Amino acid sequence: MTRSNIEIIRNIYGAFETGDMAAFSAALAPDIVWNEAENYPYADRNPYVGAQAIMEGVFARTAQDFDGFAVSMTDLIDGGDRVVALGRYTGTSRTTGAPLDVQAAHVWTLADGKVVQFQQHIDTLGTARTMRLAG
């Protein structure tokens, strides 16, 4: 029996939460195309292609910039080959000490049980203010 796309995405968030990056990466297609939201601090290398590029360009930088970074997606919406996740990012900026608490939405595209594309939508101004990248 195959898992539903919602289950796959729910498991991805669970793997991220527990730090199981091997399980996270296993859910991604080898040539996944990952895009951070325009004007987000880590969008400078868009698109990220492949799990290693995502780990180094997004997750390692996030861990470097934030203490206690967490992604809490409260709603998962089934759109067939797409799953939309709605929730929040939280953490504390290591540079400023300011708390991060911003809305986020993710659009995941799946094919054959693997994530082939990811698009982040987020409060980029709130993030920039937390990091003191904007006034």
Language-model segment annotations:
Residues 9-12, 23-28, 32, 50, ...:
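Hydrophobic pocket/interface hotspot
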Residues 20, 51, 98:
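Gly/Ser/Thr-rich helix-start
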Residues 10-19, 42-45, 62-66, 86-88:
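Short, mixed-charge, low-aromatic patches
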Residues 1-30, 131-135:
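Short, low-complexity N-terminal intrinsically disordered segments enriched in polar/charged residues
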Residues 30-80:
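A solvent-exposed, acidic/Ser-Thr-rich amphipathic alpha-helical stretch
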Residues 1-4, 59-135:
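A beta-strand edge to alpha-helix "cap/lid" segment located at domain peripheries
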